[in-house]
Regions:
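Juxta-kinase regulatory segment immediately upstream of eukaryotic protein kinase catalytic domains
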Residues: 1-55
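An alpha-helical support segment within catalytic cores of ATP-dependent transferases
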Residues: 28-47, 52, 114, 178-234, ...
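ATP-binding pocket architecture of kinase catalytic cores
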Residues: 53-62, 68-184
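Active-site acidic catalytic loop and adjacent metal/ATP-binding pocket
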Residues: 53-81, 85, 135-138, 219-264
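Short, contiguous acidic/charged loop-to-helix segments that flank catalytic cores in large enzymes
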Residues: 94, 157, 240, 254-260, ...
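A glycine-centered beta->alpha junction motif in the catalytic cores
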Residues: 133-156, 172-179, 195-202, 275, ...
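Active-site activation/catalytic loop segments of kinase-like enzymes and analogous catalytic loops
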Residues: 263-301, 314-332
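Amphipathic, Lys/Arg-enriched alpha-helical patches that create a basic surface
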Residues: 340-353
Length: 353
């Protein structure tokens, strides 16, 4: 666990300053990175010539910042271009200590298969440092384009290959035995699903009884799971967290990762494909993509999780309904037909369990 405890703590009297704001200041970043980051990248002989800071689109209270640094060798007085280089890093900040756990996990994954190997085209961002004084985690920037953006283009011939690669990446993750994974909390899950149920019942009173019963059934099935089948899951394995670059696939955002049912990641990913097809009216054969995804996964790992994929597809469909019409209620008014559609899809999945 390689944390960097800084001597220069946030100045007294800056209580109202968000710690992440320091990393939006080019002068601060240049000095900070030269002292604390470049040595960790074996770049101590370089100085920062220029720093470009880009605050990425972020979830509430979870900002991410891209740092593009142009470096020059300190021993290169002539500033020859061949002595210059650039690097792209991403810093993530939270107001809790979850990123400390995430950093530990990424370091363990890096050392247990994601640093090198025959399948080194299946990647994670390289963990660089965690700064507890600022609750900031720093990692390399993922190269390529989001699979979610490619999905919206609807080119099945291109998507098929990357979705198969996504299955290989997930099998690689699920095959790794980790020590630093956070345990799944059934208590947290119960509270979360209860809130989703209450919100959706408020938005769709005509479907309230059915919605409540579906959430209860999902929770009952989760309570009955045998923890012997649990392993490390990503927890938010969706196309927007997957970057493709030629043959390489890099997956980001491990904050929801924990020790739980591997089928969760499978069902969640497939549900994202299905919801994207409906939302954007994409000309995709999602059933075929699902089959190819699961076939590739089970060719590399146990078929045991397949019998529970429907459970997590069902959960994800209701999560999608909640996110679209409750979390995003300022943009989307309740849609009775859409609600009926996702309830039907949820029931279909649970009937097969």
């Amino acid at each position: 666990m390689e944390y960097i405890i800084l001597a220069e703590k946030i100045p007294d009297g800056s209580i109202n300053i968000n710690p992440v704001d320091y990393f939006l200041n080019e002068a601060f970043v240049s000095n900070f990175f030269e002292v604390h980051v470049l040595p960790r990248l074996n770049l101590s002989e370089f100085r920062i010539l220029k720093c470009e800071i880009n605050r990425l689109k972020s979830r509430r209270r979870k900002p991410a910042i891209e740092f593009r640094l142009w470096l020059n060798n300190k021993n290169n007085n002539d500033n020859h271009k061949q002595q210059q280089t650039s690097i792209n890093l991403v810093g993530k900040w939270r107001n809790d200590e979850l990123l400390k756990e995430t950093f530990d996990l990424l370091q363990e994954l890096w050392s247990k298969g994601f640093q090198s190997g025959d399948d080194d085209y299946l990647k994670i961002s390289k963990p660089i440092a965690y700064f507890p004084d600022y609750n900031l985690m720093l990692a390399s920037k993922a190269n390529g384009i989001e699979l979610g953006k490619m999905l919206m283009e609807g080119d099945a011939s291109v998507l098929e290959n990357y979705i198969i690669q996504a299955a290989s990446w997930l099998a690689k993750l699920h095959n790794i035995d980790v020590r630093s994974g956070r345990a799944f909390s059934l208590e947290t899950e119960e509270a979360k699903l209860r809130h989703w149920s209450e919100h959706l019942c408020f938005l769709y009173p005509d479907f309230a009884e059915k919605i409540s019963n579906l959430f209860s059934l999902i929770l009952d099935k989760e309570r009955s799971l045998d923890s012997k089948c649990f392993g490390l899951i990503h927890g938010d394995y969706n196309p927007n967290n997957i970057f493709v670059d030629g043959n390489d696939i890099t997956v980001i955002d491990f904050e929801q990762s924990c020790i739980f049912d591997p089928a969760f990641d499978l069902g969640y990913f497939i549900a994202k494909l299905i919801s994207a097809k409906r939302k954007y009216n994409l000309p995709l054969d999602v059933d075929d993509l699902e089959k190819r995804f699961l076939d590739k996964y089970t060719a590399k790992i146990s078929i045991e999780p397949l019998k529970r994929v429907g459970l997590y597809k069902a959960r994800s469909f209701l999560q999608h309904l909640h996110f679209r019409y409750w979390t995003g209620r300022s943009h989307h008014k309740p849609d009775q037909l859409d609600c009926q559609y996702w309830i039907n899809k949820t029931e279909e999945c649970l009937q097969l369990q």
